[in-house]
Curated annotation (Swiss-Prot):
Belongs to the cytochrome b5 family. MAPR subfamily. This is Neuferricin. InterPro entries: Cyt_B5-like_heme/steroid-bd, Cyt_B5-like_heme/steroid_sf, MAPR/NEUFC/NENF-like. It comes from Homo sapiens (Human). Changing residue 7 to P: In a colorectal cancer sample; somatic mutation. GO terms for cellular component: endomembrane system; extracellular region; membrane.
Amino acid sequence: MLRCGGRGLLLGLAVAAAAVMAARLMGWWGPRAGFRLFIPEELSRYRGGPGDPGLYLALLGRVYDVSSGRRHYEPGSHYSGFAGRDASRAFVTGDCSEAGLVDDVSDLSAAEMLTLHNWLSFYEKNYVCVGRVTGRFYGEDGLPTPALTQVEAAITRGLEANKLQLQEKQTFPPCNAEWSSARGSRLWCSQKSGGVSRDWIGVPRKLYKPGAKEPRCVCVRTTGPPSGQMPDNPPHRNRGDLDHPNLAEYTGCPPLAITCSFPL
C-alpha cells in the first residue's frame, strides 16, 4: 500500500524474465495510435474537484483515469497530491510535499525502479490508460524521450539482477539463525530454511559476495553435482556445492553438521 512519508513503497518485486518484461515495457511505452497527449497544464485540471473534467494521474508519463478509485485521489483524500500530475518519484520516496511530488526519477536505484515498475503494473491492471503527458518522458510527438529509455533500461537491468538473486537463493538458501544471552548463537539448515522449500537440507557455510562487508550464512547442498554443471561435464565428486570458491566453513563447526552452535 502506498504511504506518504516513508521511503520504500514496495508492492513486492515481480518475478519474471527480463526479456519478457522488456517486451511488455515497449508495449506500454512504444508508439500507439489514438492516444491523447496532455500538456502538464492541461493535466493539472484533472484533480476531481467540482467542475473539473475528470480525475487523472500520471506515472512515468502515462496518464490513467483513476475515477473508479476516487476516494483515494479526490480533493481532501490522503493521496490527492498525486492527481492531475506526474508524481512518479513520490511513489518510491513517499514524499508527498510539493517538492516531492515530481517526475524526476533519474537518481533512483535499480530496486526503486522495480518499485515503479510494480506500480505501473498495478495501474495498467486496475485503471484505464487514457493518454500521455508531454515533458520528461514523452515528447510533443508522443514518442518516448531519452529519459524514458533510460528508465526502461534501468528496469530491465533490475529485473535481470532480481532474477539472478532469486536463482542464487535457490542454490544457497539462507540459514535459520537464533541468539540468546544464555546459549549464544545457533545457525542451522532445514528443508525450508530461508523460505526455500527443497528436497535437501544442506549444511551452514559462509558465503562471501564481492562488495559485501560481511559474509552471510547459507545452506549448501552436500551431494550430487555442483549447481549448473552440464550433463556432458567430467564426473563430479558427489559433493554438491561444497567446493564453491566463495564458500567457507564456520570455525569450530563440523564440516557436515546441519547445525552450528557458538556458545558465549
